[in-house]
């Protein structure tokens, strides 16, 4: 909410800490402020965005999200001195300030995407698609976290497959089953990503939730595509007791969820 943004900014500034925001979903968050906060129902998304960023000292932006491009991003600053310090690293590692390692085509697409991303008809379409998929998945028996968000539907893989313990990654197992059932690709946000050893006891600690994320590509799917995802999910749930857990056979020391290899538990 705008109130949370404002209060968080005040706390940071009270202690002399610059308040930077992760801006990758700025437009979708502005849309939710508009449709959920009565004070902003008659305020345009663009004006809501301006107010959101008025509380910040800067931002980081993965433009692959709400700028609707396939590559790129930026960092923005209010403090010109801080900008200069960061700019030196940019020149050394990425490219000059005017392009930052991106092609002209990608810069042009990013500029257009920032405008398109705050179009209210687009945001309404985007949010309604996500909401629709959430309802489709609920109807076939998947435990969906409600209300759904702007870019994805989250399913509780642990509840969907209660016979699979956390040590065998139930959300990954459900994601694999969906891919085999219908070519539906999802992402685990659970213990494959977050499991770690307690620094004091050495005990393995699992993630609080075993989530499976259904992130929806933008401006690509029709509702028939979402119905197809539901059909694949329904097939999985009919045979849920046959889905087996998984074990890691190889993993790098860091970021294992990107590169790990797993196989079914016998």
Task: Pin down the residues of each PLM region.
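Short, conserved charged micro-motifs
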Residues: 83-84, 162-170, 219-228
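Short acidic (Asp/Glu) and glycine-rich catalytic loops that position anionic groups and cofactors
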Residues: 87-90, 107-116, 151-160, 207-213, ...
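PLP-dependent enzyme catalytic core of the Aspartate aminotransferase-like
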Residues: 117, 181, 193-266
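Conserved glycine-rich beta-strand-loop-beta hairpin in the small C-terminal domain of fold type I
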Residues: 130-131, 145-157
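Active-site loop ensemble at the mouth of alpha/beta enzyme cores that anchors a bound cofactor
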Residues: 158-185, 199-207
């Amino acid at each position: 909410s705008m109130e949370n943004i404002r209060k968080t900014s005040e706390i940071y500034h009270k202690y002399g800490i610059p308040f930077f925001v992760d801006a990758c979903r700025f437009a979708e968050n502005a849309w939710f402020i508009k449709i959920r906060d009565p004070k902003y129902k008659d305020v345009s998304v663009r004006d809501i965005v301006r107010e959101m960023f008025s509380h910040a000292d800067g931002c980081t932006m993965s433009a692959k999200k709400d700028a609707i491009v396939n590559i790129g991003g930026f960092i923005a600053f209010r403090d010109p001195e801080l900008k200069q310090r960061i700019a030196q690293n940019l020149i050394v590692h990425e490219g000059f300030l005017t392009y930052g390692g991106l092609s002209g085509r990608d810069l042009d697409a990013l500029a257009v995407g920032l405008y398109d991303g705050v179009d209210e008809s687009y945001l309404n379409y985007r949010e309604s698609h996500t909401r629709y998929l959430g309802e489709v998945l609920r109807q076939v028996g998947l435990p969906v976290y409600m209300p759904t968000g702007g870019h994805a539907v989250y399913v509780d893989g642990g509840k969907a497959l209660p016979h699979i313990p956390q040590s065998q990654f139930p959300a990954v197992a459900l994601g694999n089953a969906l891919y085999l059932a219908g070519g539906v690709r999802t992402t685990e946000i659970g213990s494959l990503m977050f499991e770690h050893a307690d620094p004091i006891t050495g005990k393995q600690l699992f993630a609080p939730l075993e989530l499976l994320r259904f992130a929806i590509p933008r401006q690509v799917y029709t509702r028939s595509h979402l119905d197809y995802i539901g059909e694949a999910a329904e097939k999985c749930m009919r045979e849920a007791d046959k889905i087996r857990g998984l074990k890691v056979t190889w993993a790098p020391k860091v970021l294992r969820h990107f590169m790990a290899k797993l196989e079914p538990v016998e």
